[in-house]
């Protein structure tokens, strides 16, 4: 009942279709059917319910209209929206996502070729001649299988190894100690890798006694991990479609994101993305404890879902509704602690490796700081560091910049004439974190995909950013490629990084612009032809904040209270619900 394609309903061909009247729509249509003037050539359907307020891209978006012409044309003006039982929007988006996930696996396939003979545990991936770079198939999953001792069946966080140089000589830290390493991932991601390894080793054992195809164990490990990551991304698509409200088709951008092709199987970030987006869905459905559990699980896989709590806190202060948020935070903290506590107590040195590694990392090659260094010759904030010596100045600068960004977001959230949507503030928070952070690994961009779709559902703008972001992968790989005659200079790579960062900044600017002009927000407006009686949509992700009046605490200073005099915040033009990027004249 959620399809945008619908079923044609018979009606008087000489009359215009009666407009929707929200809850009274079905009754009004039924009354009209009883009139003797109806000359429908066929008997009318008994049930004429239709989700007429749903956004149909074939009617409102030039890109959607063009794609609709490929598969049979736009939605008809007499269609019953949301009545198709088979090809519902969610199933269509699942099919699209499976295609892009298959493309994502195919981009890594060249790195899954193996060498050696014998059983699977005696074969290794063939990465000779830097294949991973010139064939653009690099994935952390393959080298981590051996580097983090998973190939030996050892438990993460318990087992360690000594860091060596290219000659096999043990590395010494800046303080003279031997560099000892442990698994560098949060606990849930580490356990996921361990379970994937166990399944891969089980298959290897079975292939020795049963007539099964012999597959290199590291390749089977990748395939098992990729299967779970694909399910996690499908979960992200499902949760985004539930959060999109009447704009359910916006979630198709998550399913068909160009970033999926290159980054979905580069690392394990899809686990956290699926859990975090599901947590937002639970919040939207006013289940704060479940939201906290899912956000806590996401944070146990990757820390970034914890950032979701900050926008909720700001909106809770503005609306004066902190009870539900307190339950969410308590559930998130309890869940995170429940997952981490056993490893924290049994293997404290291994558990803390994730935090220790992030403290001592310098500015990553994808960061804005490295972009400046590549064009100016600047040596960075900490130019003379020993091996594994923490960059104290860089860490301080990154922290201060993010605090300033959070302060700006707080000011916007508390003073905007109309309360911002949860997705808008969450996108601004995560995007700010990535922009000022010293590390922006390529797969981190997956964090932004569902948030950007929910915060700024302008399809062509989002596709432009996603395409730029996805293409960063190509010069990155060829910059790392060590063949002087075929590799690219650093500036080619850092230029694309700069373009990516500018694109994200533009998205942030557009989100802020729409916060101060909610009449231009495609989510909040009722859509093309919507009636004032139907009202708009306050916030599909808002949960307890949706349609709530502002009630900030009395001790909040006046300069942090909503600015109610801004007339721009109340503008609602007749076509405000129409995508401004749509320049055509197509109408259903």
Please name every model-derived segment.
Residues 4-8, 15-121, 127, 222, ...:
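Start-transfer (signal-anchor) and selected internal transmembrane alpha helices
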Residues 215-247, 276, 404-412:
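Transmembrane-helix motifs of polytopic, lipid-linked glycan transferases
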Residues 237-257, 419-420:
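Transmembrane-helix signature of polytopic, membrane-embedded enzymes
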Residues 259-263, 279-280, 289-314, 429-435:
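Membrane-interface alpha helices of multi-pass inner-membrane proteins
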Residues 264-272:
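Short acidic/glycine- and proline-prone juxtamembrane loop motifs at membrane-interface regions
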Residues 272-288:
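Specific aromatic-rich, kink-prone transmembrane helix
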Residues 307-337, 341, 345:
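Perimembrane helix-loop-helix junctions
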Residues 365-435, 517-571, 575-587:
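Aromatic/glycine/proline-enriched transmembrane-helix motif characteristic
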